[in-house]
């Protein structure tokens, strides 16, 4: 049990109920689920809630196109969403819908409190009207040129290019997204939330540590531009909640969508009477509330939402955590343009635990975009999960079952166990701070140590000798205990694997039991727990989504260059572009001392366009090397990897420092570079022969 139990409510942004979940969505739900599972693993009371965002004109119009009622459409989508999440092992404590009685009552409650407190203003405005469809046009159904940055083809509420928010009437050359007609102006009465009244409170809250620094800095730009009153009204016809005392007027979807967090929790409280809504949402609540969101909805969650809560007498969230976008092989994912892999398409071909681990290995607390590079995905999963983690058990468990009655020995030398347990606080801190990539590197470094221990001891040789049976029993028991610790550390990321390992050990994996003595404990016969990623399955998934995986000009200009599985810039005949060099004799080759090296640390070099500074462990000695691979790798992607270096190259003094060798890489250059990565059995310091 954790030292002091916390009460935590955690949410992910609500997926829109007009289409399927894709892998861009899944980043957020996997990120949040890992954090929620970690909190529960530490013994905290943590509730992970979500819901479908089920209102708005897009849903109304799509239902019309399908010839069904909006209620029927969102019910079907809700069912599909929940199935996708369940199959990805995302464990919500409650999944609801914003089109619910709980949410209607909460939205009305908050609106009426804001109105009674003087924060709702009414005024007549000129609204864009589609003369062909005889309907007012919601902001998402007007497209034109952004009035701020002049980017074309932007929606009527905010710009995807610069992030600015504005009124649809401010768009340059607006067009109806419904009919294509040029809209006309028509007067209508709307209600506005007085956001400027909360400027002082918001400036204090956004700098209180509730937001990432990058988010807080962005909000400062909006403060400088001046906060505007927020139109919370949409005219009929509209699928949503009617505003109290205002027939024909409806809440804008972005008013009742975040309230959906509260509505979903209300629904959970009704199912579990021991829960108190006010204990988590009351103004004086000491519970913790955290929102995980994408960087595209920062404005709504960091300005409108806390102001609405404050103005209606509820508490603000402790933190709002934003993440970046997902790209696939360097291409921007866009649902509107169809460049996405559906969650169900992935599940039809690949194990969801693969993606959970890959996302975790690349996630940090920053708001960086994350590239799902399918080649790297396959290599990393096969190397880390199959080659290192599961391999540790598969190569030792059989000896315990066949030769030692399935019972573990009392471990005499606990040096390795103590070293593994000593990392629990570091790994815990990384989970808590959402630095999952760093946690995965720590865990895989331990897996390397464990595999090195088994390789050096070679129990498969020991069991051939009568006088080494006890030693073999010790080695295999030690290895399996280390495996148990590793999988416990990974339980928030790999819940299905953890479940299989619990069945194998015939006991639960808990953080409190990390140091448990398993002497004499009986294990079950080992069964295969994870298969390698097969490229034919990856290719089949790509084929099913082939229209979504083309690298186009839509790739984000600010994203770091990524390596693609089949980069068009790489020649199909490398020998044509780079012929084999002149023949050398064996004595010349023998002078080159190639060694396995682990990249302990990688970092950018100030004022260097191409270089990364690497600290390399070559087995008892550390070398500093400057490598020209900055265009192809980010530092966090390199740390923990094994590679090959020229160890006897004369040190070279550079203006950035001394370079004590060279790492080997293949490719024509630029983003098309791949460092050499040896098989997982290789160890730092080994000579390459």
From Swiss-Prot:
Subcellular location field: Cytoplasm
Catalytic activity: tRNA(Met) + L-methionine + ATP = L-methionyl-tRNA(Met) + AMP + diphosphate
Gene3D superfamilies in the cross-refs: HUPs, Isoleucyl-tRNA Synthetase, Domain 1, Methionyl-tRNA synthetase, Zn-domain, Nucleic acid-binding proteins
Keywords: Aminoacyl-tRNA synthetase, ATP-binding, Cytoplasm, Ligase, Metal-binding, Nucleotide-binding, Protein biosynthesis, RNA-binding, tRNA-binding, Zinc
Pfam families: Anticodon_3 (PF19303), tRNA-synt_1g (PF09334), tRNA_bind (PF01588)
Any one biological process term the GO annotation gives: methionyl-tRNA aminoacylation
UniProt superkingdom: Bacteria
Protein residues bound to Zn(2+): 146, 149, 159, 162
Motif 'KMSKS' region: chain residues: 332-336
Residues that bind ATP: 335
Disulfide bonds: none
EC numbers, comma separated: 6.1.1.10
Subunit structure: Homodimer.
Similarity remark: Belongs to the class-I aminoacyl-tRNA synthetase family. MetG type 1 subfamily.
HAMAP family linked to this entry: Met_tRNA_synth_type1 (MF_00098)
NCBIfam families reported for this sequence: metG, metG_C_term, PRK00133.1
Protein name per its UniProtKB record: Methionine--tRNA ligase
Biological source species: Shewanella baltica (strain OS223)
Taxon lineage: Bacteria, Pseudomonadati, Pseudomonadota, Gammaproteobacteria, Alteromonadales
């Amino acid at each position: 049990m954790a030292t002091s139990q916390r009460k935590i409510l955690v949410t992910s942004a609500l997926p829109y109920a007009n289409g399927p979940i894709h892998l861009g969505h899944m980043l957020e739900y996997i990120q949040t689920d890992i954090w929620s599972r970690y909190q529960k693993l530490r013994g905290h009371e943590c509730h992970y809630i979500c819901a479908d965002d089920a209102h708005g004109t897009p849903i109304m119009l799509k239902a019309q196109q399908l010839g069904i009622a909006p209620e029927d459409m969102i019910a079907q989508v809700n069912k599909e969403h929940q199935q996708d999440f369940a199959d990805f092992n995302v464990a919500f404590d409650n999944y609801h819908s914003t089109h619910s009685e709980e949410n209607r009552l909460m939205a009305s409650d908050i609106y009426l409190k804001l109105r009674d407190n003087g924060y709702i203003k009414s005024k007549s405005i000129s609204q864009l009207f589609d003369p062909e469809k005889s309907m007012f046009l919601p902001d998402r159904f007007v497209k034109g040129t952004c009035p701020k940055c002049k980017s074309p083809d932007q929606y009527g509420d905010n710009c995807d290019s610069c992030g600015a928010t504005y009124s649809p009437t401010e768009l340059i050359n607006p067009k109806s997204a419904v009919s294509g007609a040029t809209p006309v102006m028509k007067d209508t009465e709307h209600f506005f939330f007085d956001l400027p009244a909360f400027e002082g409170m918001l400036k204090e809250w956004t700098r209180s540590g509730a937001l990432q620094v990058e988010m807080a800095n962005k909000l400062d730009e909006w403060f400088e531009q001046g906060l505007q009153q927020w139109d919370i009204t949409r005219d009929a016809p509209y699928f949503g909640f009617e505003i109290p005392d205002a027939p024909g007027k409806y809440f804008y979807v972005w008013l009742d969508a975040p309230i959906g967090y509260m509505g979903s929790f209300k629904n959970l409280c009704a199912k579990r009477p021991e829960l108190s809504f006010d204990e988590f949402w009351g103004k004086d609540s000491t519970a913790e509330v955290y929102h995980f969101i994408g960087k595209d909805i920062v404005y709504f969650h960091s300005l409108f939402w806390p102001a609405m809560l404050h103005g209606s007498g509820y508490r603000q969230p402790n933190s709002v955590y934003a993440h970046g976008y997902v790209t696939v092989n360097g291409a921007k994912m866009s649902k509107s343009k169809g460049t996405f892999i559906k969650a169900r398409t992935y599940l039809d071909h690949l194990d969801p635990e693969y993606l959970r681990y890959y996302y975790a290995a690349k996630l940090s607390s920053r708001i960086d975009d994350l590239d799902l590079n399918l080649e790297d995905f396959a290599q990393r999963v096969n190397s880390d999960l199959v080659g290192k983690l599961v391999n540790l058990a598969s190569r030792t468990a059989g000896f315990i079952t066949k030769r030692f009655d399935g019972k573990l020995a009392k471990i005499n030398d606990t040096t390795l166990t103590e070293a593994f347990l000593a990392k629990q606080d570091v790994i815990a801190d990384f989970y808590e701070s959402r630095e999952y990539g760093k946690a995965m590197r720590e865990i895989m470094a331990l897996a390397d140590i464990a595999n090195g221990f088994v390789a050096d001891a070679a129990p498969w040789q020991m069991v051939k000798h009568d006088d080494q049976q006890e030693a073999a029993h010790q080695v295999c028991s030690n290895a399996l205990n280390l495996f148990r610790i590793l999988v416990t550390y990974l339980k928030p990321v790999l819940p299905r694997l953890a479940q299989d390992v619990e069945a194998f050990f015939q006991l639960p994996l808990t953080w409190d039991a990390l140091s448990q003595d398993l002497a004499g404990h009986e294990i079950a016969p080992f069964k295969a727990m994870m298969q390698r990623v097969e490229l034919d399955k990856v290719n089949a998934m790509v084929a099913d989504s082939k229209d979504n995986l083309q690298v186009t000009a839509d790739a984000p200009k600010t994203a770091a260059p990524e390596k693609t599985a089949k980069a068009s810039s790489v020649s199909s005949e490398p020998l044509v572009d780079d012929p084999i060099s002149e023949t050398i004799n064996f004595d010349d080759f023998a002078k080159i001392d190639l060694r396995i090296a682990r990249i302990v640390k990688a970092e950018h070099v100030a004022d260097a366009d191409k270089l990364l500074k690497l600290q390399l462990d070559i087995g008892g000695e550390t070398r500093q090397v400057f490598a020209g691979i900055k265009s192809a790798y980010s530092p966090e992607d390199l740390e923990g990897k094994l590679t090959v270096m020229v160890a006897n190259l004369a040190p070279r003094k550079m203006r950035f420092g001394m370079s004590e060798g060279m790492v080997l890489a293949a490719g024509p250059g630029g983003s098309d570079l791949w460092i050499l990565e040896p098989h997982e059995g290789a160890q730092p310091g080994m000579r390459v022969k």
